[in-house]
Amino acid sequence: MAANYSSTGSRKEHVKVTSDPQPGFLERLSETSGGMFVGLVTFLLSFYLIFTNEGRALKTANLLAEGLSLVVSPDSIHSVAPENEGRLVHIIGALRTSKLLSDPNYGVHLPAVKLRRHVEMYQWVETEESNEYTEDGQVKKETKYSYNTEWRSEIVSSKNFDREIGHKNPSAMAVESFTATAPFVQIGRFFLSAGLIDKIDNFKPLSLAKLEDPHVDIIRRGDFFYHSENPKYPEVGDVRVSFSYAGLSSDDPDLGPAHVVTVIARQRGDQLIPYSTKSGDTLLLLHHGDFSAEEVFRREQKSNSMKTWGLRAAGWMAMFMGLNLMTRILYTLVDWFPVFRDLVNIGLKAFAFCVATSLTLLTVAAGWLFYRPLWAALLGCLALVPIIIARTRVPTKKLE
């Protein structure tokens, strides 16, 4: 099926060298001015990211605390208790579905919440390595383009290659990837809402060892179905298909017992739906495994804390990069003097580090003002430390 496309030989590569006149002072100054605008936008966005992150973190913490104080655990999942109607309930049990999920084209059938068909095509892939250097007053860029064949799940457009001749890929796959989802999923007598079903994403690879070749033109090798004349030596355009599943919904002699999950949700009849809190937020949790209600909320609080620190770090980094770009023009003004240029570069980075750290702490404190005023005041004092240190070092250097 790959006869119309490039044959797969050994790894191919070629080198291209381009040259441009070395930019003058005014040209470099103009480029730096553009970087200042990008830096300003990045700098301002960092404030928004840090401030809103604090609001989100505290809001989530309060939401989880409220949920833990309200949650109840029914005596049995095999009966619907009327006294829990509208309440936040803690449910543990094995998943069940009403019918098998299948892909008849490949003879795959199994009890699961989700069945995913993953398709890859053998294609040419271009990689490039660049090296810039100055020679005879010109800036030269040497780029090495390499071409190799790989299995890829996305179409690689050979039209964007530096050299398409001899490395042409098909424009579409003969088979498409898809995910089938069971329409109804239960735990005991309770039906899971669409939001809970979406959270069942613990995909595991499906072994094809006991399946036969579904068609004459499809060959099974290991855990793949190959649309290829020779899977051992594939050609560009050949396709291979694998399967994975999430949420095993029945005991299976080959795949194991049905998957057990822990759910925190609102009971409405025999439905498990999102719970609306007093603050207007919704609570809908699903964890893979058997956990007590306290353990579920403890895991959620830990996840919230990790996300908060991750976004704080991202905000600080955005602020640091923004300040670097905004002050880059000072480096450009002195880059004709190597020794002085290096000193200025170190000083600008130290300045950006101190200012980014101080402003990040101040922004975090501002985000806490509405929730924890005392902690906000403490953070505000800590935020002044880097600035005080930086200012006290300046007179010392002058005296030296």
Curated annotation (Swiss-Prot):
Q: Which GO terms describe its cellular component?
A: endoplasmic reticulum lumen; endoplasmic reticulum membrane; nuclear inner membrane; plasma membrane
Membrane topology term reads:
Multi-pass membrane protein
Q: Which InterPro entries match?
A: TMEM43_fam (IPR012430)
One Pfam entry for this protein is: TMEM43
The keyword Ribosomal protein is annotated on this UniProt entry: no
Question: Which terms does the record give in the GO molecular function aspect?
Answer: identical protein binding
Keywords (alphabetical) are: Acetylation, Cell membrane, Endoplasmic reticulum, Immunity, Innate immunity, Membrane, Nucleus, Transmembrane, Transmembrane helix
**Sequence ranges on the Nuclear membrane side:** 2-31, 335-345, 390-400
Q: Name one GO biological process term.
A: innate immune response
Give the organism the record lists: Rattus norvegicus
Q: Which family does it belong to?
A: Belongs to the TMEM43 family.
Q: How does it assemble?
A: Can form oligomers through the transmembrane domains. Interacts with EMD; the interaction retains EMD at the inner nuclear membrane. Interacts with LMNA and LMNB2. Interacts with SUN2. Interacts with RNF26; this interaction is important to modulate innate immune signaling through the cGAS-STING pathway. Interacts with CARD10. Interacts with gap junctions proteins GJB2/Cx26 and GJB4/Cx30.
Sites where N-acetylalanine occurs are at 2
What is the documented function of this protein?
Answer: May have an important role in maintaining nuclear envelope structure by organizing protein complexes at the inner nuclear membrane. Required for retaining emerin at the inner nuclear membrane. Plays a role in the modulation of innate immune signaling through the cGAS-STING pathway by interacting with RNF26. In addition, functions as a critical signaling component in mediating NF-kappa-B activation by acting downstream of EGFR and upstream of CARD10. Contributes to passive conductance current in cochlear glia-like supporting cells, mediated by gap junctions and necessary for hearing.
Which segments cross the bilayer?
32-52, 314-334, 346-366, 369-389
- The source's domain of life comes to Eukaryota
The subcellular location is: Endoplasmic reticulum membrane; Nucleus inner membrane; Cell membrane
Q: What is this protein called?
A: Transmembrane protein 43
Renumbered to this chain, region (Disordered) spans: 1-23
Record topology, Perinuclear space segments: 53-313, 367-368
